[in-house]
Amino acid sequence: MPQPSRPRKGSMGFSPRSRAASEVPRFNSWPDDEGQPGLQGFAGYKAGMSHVVAINDEPNSPREGQEETVPVTVVETPPMRAVAVRAYEDTPYGKRPLTEVWTDEVHEDLERSLSVPEEQSGDIEGDIRTALDEGALADVRVITHTVPGALSSVPKKEPDVMETRVGGGSLSDRVDFALDLVDDGGEHTVTDVFRAGEYTDVAGITKGKGTQGPVKRWGVQKRKGKHARQGWRRRIGNLGPWNPSRVRSTVPQQGQTGYHQRTELNKRLIDLGDDDVSPDGGFVNYGEVDGPYALVKGSVPGPDKRLVRFRPAVRPGDQPRLDPEVRYVSTASNQG
């Protein structure tokens, strides 16, 4: 059998593999929600991994109704704050911000991240409702931020600011929900947005590995035999043909590895709670989880202490039952 061709591993769809512009991941699309108006996103800080014993509730599964061990990632999810409402309009170049309304009372640490508007001139809230009546309003989003200063395990006070879409109901209902949320102080929790058992999409910035060669970066084979004895075992054989006289972007070369934004689809929320979930001695490189948390089935991108964002799944498959039965959460220490 001939040797199959494998010039590299990995999708070219992720190229160029450069460092992420920000540690706060972004969502470029949002699901269409036909339920009640509400926020379509939340964020937390990755603490580490553990495992739980839960009842398999997947319909038509051979193990339905039986106990099984599930690996989970623990994400600490302290309450977030909504500080502004941003309205969008349709233009020939896509959606563009129309105007935004800021709350008068913001958290004291928010000025570490951005310059907070001191005062706003005119009736901006009235402008949003006027645009709604005229049919010029296309979408409503809320500017939210985390409060990492309230966590003992995240060594920073600078909030992470992000934009979250308001979904569900009519456009008028979404405007009312967003304005009421900001007027009421803007504080909201993960249980206000999600429910245990839902499928979510998780976005994060992966662990950075610096500059790496083509073997680690692209998974190419090391040279063998006489080619390796030339002195370069971990280099590629050539950069391409004489013509066209340029190096193509498909050639696997050394470069930045890791610290990329990645979004993983259909991650199930196993549990949302605030009970003791920390292992004996705390999570390695993180510490104790003192407040609300989310247990996500499987792994999520990024190292410990890094921000991860959630949104409702944009491509949900067959949704299992909500509120899965968790019988045991491991708090055993792996450090002895």
UniProtKB/Swiss-Prot annotation:
- Note down the stretches annotated as region Disordered: 1-43, 205-230, 311-336
Q: Where is the composition biased (Basic residues)?
A: 219-230
Question: Per the record, GO CC terms?
Answer: cytosolic large ribosomal subunit
Q: Which GO terms describe its molecular function?
A: rRNA binding; structural constituent of ribosome
Q: What Pfam families has UniProt attached to this entry?
A: Ribosomal_L3
What keywords would UniProt list here? Ribonucleoprotein, Ribosomal protein, RNA-binding, rRNA-binding
Q: Which GO terms fall under biological process for this protein?
A: translation
Q: Looking at the keywords, is rRNA-binding present?
A: yes
Record-linked InterPro entries: L3_arc_euk, Ribosomal_L3_dom_3_arc_sf, Ribosomal_uL3, Ribosomal_uL3_arc, Ribosomal_uL3_CS, Transl_B-barrel_sf
* Gene3D superfamilies for the chain: 3.30.1430.10, Ribosomal protein L3, domain 3 (4.10.960.10), Translation factors (2.40.30.10)
Subunit composition?
Part of the 50S ribosomal subunit. Forms a cluster with proteins L14 and L24e.
Q: What does this protein do?
A: One of the primary rRNA binding proteins, it binds directly near the 3'-end of the 23S rRNA, where it nucleates assembly of the 50S subunit.
Question: Which family is annotated?
Answer: Belongs to the universal ribosomal protein uL3 family.
What name does UniProt use for this protein? Large ribosomal subunit protein uL3
